[in-house]
């Protein structure tokens, strides 16, 4: 059953169109990698899926999803964020506060469980800014998990990580998808990772987008012709 259906979707920013008439769907338990050149609209799509940006045309239909966990790209300012690991993970529950001013016992328990699931419980009292890049990404992934058990939107989750931390992050995401059936939508420039882990690939480009299985993508012109524009 589809959790997200994008129908005839058109997106743009600053008055410039980045994609038009895009159609794809995401089912429960899917692992969709979104690839494409810079400026093709990948991050704009993430904002639209999160409800932070209205489409220029078409529609986004969500079924059975109350909350979406989001792991954004980090900048240098965010890497030095002055908070403990526990506080960062707990902030994933902000959307569930509603009119409440304080976190509940359930919120705090959820944060502890997410830290334990990702193996960072011993870091709970450490300052986020003192952690390595790989540890910080684990914390942000735990924060996204704390928001939801249904779907994760990950925008370049391995950006800036060394090879060992990159492999660790990909394995974590894959386990959450395979073992816990959490739906994953991940923006990436790493085509090899998309082919290794994803069940489907959405290639965004100026020409009609490609949307199919990872195996079909491997055999498509999008992948064959310099991994560039689609010529389907």
PLM feature spans:
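Conserved ABC ATPase "signature" region
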Residues: 105-123
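H-loop/switch region of ABC-family ATPase nucleotide-binding domains
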Residues: 188-189
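Conserved ABC ATPase signature
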Residues: 127-131, 135
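Catalytic Walker B motif of ABC-type/P-loop ATPase nucleotide-binding domains
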Residues: 152-155
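H-loop (His-switch) and adjacent beta-strand-loop-beta switch element
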Residues: 200-214
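Helix N-cap at the start of a conserved alpha-helix in ABC-type nucleotide-binding domains
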Residues: 163-165
């Amino acid at each position: 059953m589809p959790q997200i259906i994008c129908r005839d979707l058109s997106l743009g920013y600053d008055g410039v169109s980045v994609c038009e008439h895009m159609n794809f769907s995401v089912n429960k338990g899917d692992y969709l990698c979104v690839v494409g050149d810079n400026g093709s609209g990948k991050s704009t799509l993430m904002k639209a899926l999160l409800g932070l940006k209205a489409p220029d045309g078409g529609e986004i239909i969500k079924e059975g999803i109350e909350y979406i966990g989001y792991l954004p790209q980090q900048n240098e300012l965010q890497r030095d964020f002055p908070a403990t690991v526990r506080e960062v993970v707990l902030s994933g529950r902000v959307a569930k506060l509603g009119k409440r001013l304080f976190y509940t016992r359930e919120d705090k328990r959820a944060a502890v469980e997410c830290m334990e699931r990702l193996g960072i419980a011993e870091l709970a009292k450490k300052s986020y800014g003192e952690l390595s890049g790989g540890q910080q990404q684990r914390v942000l992934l735990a924060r996204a998990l704390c928001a939801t058990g249904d779907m994760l939107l990950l925008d370049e989750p391995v950006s800036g990580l060394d090879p060992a931390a990159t492999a660790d992050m990909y394995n974590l995401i894959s386990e959450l998808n395979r073992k816990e059936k959490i739906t994953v939508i991940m923006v990436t420039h790493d085509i090899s990772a998309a082919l290794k882990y994803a069940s489907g690939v959405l290639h965004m480009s100026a020409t009609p987008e490609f949307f199919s299985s990872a195996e079909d993508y491997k055999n498509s012109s999008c992948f064959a012709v310099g991994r560039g524009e689609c010529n389907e």
